């Protein structure tokens, strides 16, 4: 009888109820909110479901992220091994491979001026870098945090790993992916504030057709030019363009389909759950995390505003041929930011179709954010 009582007592004491803190329970509630937003509201479920479930797991059972060196038997927690792939920058690069295989660069090729809008939206990154330094973050940490302004989760994780800022990787990744998911909420008020109804009603001419040869040459030329100028961009830009070459060449359909479907979804599952698992209460509830979340929001808002303002300049220069709304799509949240440009434009004029025009700056923003990350790596001598 005493054996049974002792056994039951051990089982009760080994349950999560005795090992969790108030912070863990609070993070569990945050995970529930994220799951609600993903499942009920449909806010980027492919990202938020695995992230929020990883958040849930690590706060119910912290040892699921136990490092190998901290374990008594030399075996780490399951999600720790997933996380190592983030830390080594493997998963972010594979995400870029999949994104490349899914992306049509035709709108950018048809309207090369879109590169300027994609570049303008990167202003938020460098503004956040300066603000992070002013708020007391070290140079490398400030650089890793600032990439949130590009609304690009994989690049944020990639740069944090390359610059050795794994301490901040969890908050950075969660902030970046959260803002990617909340693009439809954050961007419209800024876009409407900075434009007039007349500007939002501007109709743009149909883009010219892009030949197959142009689409094949584009990833090759971009890789050669960008990597020659900034070699540190090779992992991200190289994988992005390789995936796109798979798609556009037409001779490796199996590789293109695998990269854009099976491989992409497997990587998203592993990346999402491991990113969510970095949000333990101990790691997340501190003043630095609050500053990172605030800086990320400011950077994203600045990037959106810079894109719209540059779009207004282009509208003026072209005598009303460019709708400023497409400038907000210069952040690299593909294709969410382009859809937001379309939505805000159609609210002003239901017959206005901006989606394909907005896709140009949108895909340019993906390249721009990767270049910004490569620039920071070059600044700090990291290869």
Mark where each language-model region is.
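Intrinsically disordered, low-complexity non-transmembrane regions of multi-pass membrane transporters
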Residues: 1-19, 25, 71, 75, ...
């Amino acid at each position: 009888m005493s054996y049974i009582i002792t056994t039951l007592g051990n089982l009760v004491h080994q349950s999560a109820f005795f090992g969790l803190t108030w912070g863990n329970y609070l993070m569990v509630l945050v995970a529930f909110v994220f799951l609600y937003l993903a499942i009920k509201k449909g806010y980027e479920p492919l990202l938020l479901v695995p992230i929020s479930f990883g958040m849930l797991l690590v706060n119910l059972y912290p040892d699921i992220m136990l490092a190998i060196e901290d374990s008594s038997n030399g075996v780490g927690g399951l999600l720790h091994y997933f996380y190592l792939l983030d830390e080594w920058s493997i998963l972010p690069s594979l995400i870029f491979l999949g994104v490349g295989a899914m992306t049509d660069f035709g709108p950018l090729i048809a309207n090369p001026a879109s590169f300027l809008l994609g570049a303008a939206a990167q202003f938020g990154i460098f503004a956040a870098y300066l603000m992070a330094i002013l708020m007391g973050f070290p140079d490398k940490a400030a650089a890793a945090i600032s990439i949130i302004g590009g609304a690009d989760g994989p690049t944020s994780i990639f740069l944090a790993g390359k610059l050795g800022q794994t301490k901040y990787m969890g908050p950075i990744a969660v902030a970046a992916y959260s803002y990617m998911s909340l693009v439809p909420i954050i961007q419209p008020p800024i876009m409407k504030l900075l434009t007039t109804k007349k500007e939002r009603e501007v109709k743009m001419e149909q883009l010219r057709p892009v030949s197959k040869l142009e689409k094949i040459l584009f990833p090759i030329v971009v890789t050669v030019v960008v990597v020659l100028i900034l070699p540190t961009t090779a992992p991200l830009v190289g994988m992005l363009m390789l995936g796109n070459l798979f798609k556009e060449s037409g001779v490796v359909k199996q590789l293109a389909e695998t990269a854009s479907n099976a491989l992409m979804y497997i990587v998203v599952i592993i990346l999402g759950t491991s990113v969510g698992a970095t949000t333990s209460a101990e790691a997340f509830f501190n003043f630095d995390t609050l500053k990172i979340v605030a800086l990320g929001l400011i950077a994203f808002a600045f990037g959106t505003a810079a894109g719209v303002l540059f779009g207004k300049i282009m509208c003026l220069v072209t005598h009303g041929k460019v709708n400023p709304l497409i400038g907000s799509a210069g952040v690299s949240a593909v294709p969410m930011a382009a859809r937001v440009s379309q939505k805000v434009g159609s609210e002003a004029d239901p017959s206005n179709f901006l989606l394909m025009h907005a896709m140009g700056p949108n895909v340019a923003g993906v390249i721009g954010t990767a270049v910004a990350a490569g620039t920071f790596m070059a600044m700090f001598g990291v290869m």
